[in-house]
Amino acid sequence: YNAALKRLGDERPDFLAAVTDLTASACEKRNAVTPDAPGVFYQSVMSYCRRAQHGKFPLNMTYPIVKHFDGLNDGLVAVDSARWGERFTLLEPKGKRGISHGDVVDLNRENIPGFDVREFYVSLAADLKRRGF
């Protein structure tokens, strides 16, 4: 991965450090020195894959690494690392396929049975509007 990232322009890639920086323990350390700002509504959204094959490259490769350190994950971030704020939403995959990190950010522009990413973000924005944001 480092060689591929270097060809893409990263002068000093460190793939493993990037992945381990998202472990639950690394997030806990970072959160301890990053307090919430007063008056800001914090919420988090997370999904997970059922198997490594449910994420496209490179998430299919990072899934087992994250699983080894922290368990249930979306191919990049562990569920326990993502919990933050007043509201936490866990997107539960329907059926055998999971919902990868790439799926949640609509990286692959895929239609996933039981999960419409565009409608999810519309409902998220509508909820923020209802809350007065």
Over which residues does each language-model region extend?
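Helical cap/lid subdomain of alpha/beta-hydrolase-fold lipid enzymes
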Residues: Y1-F133
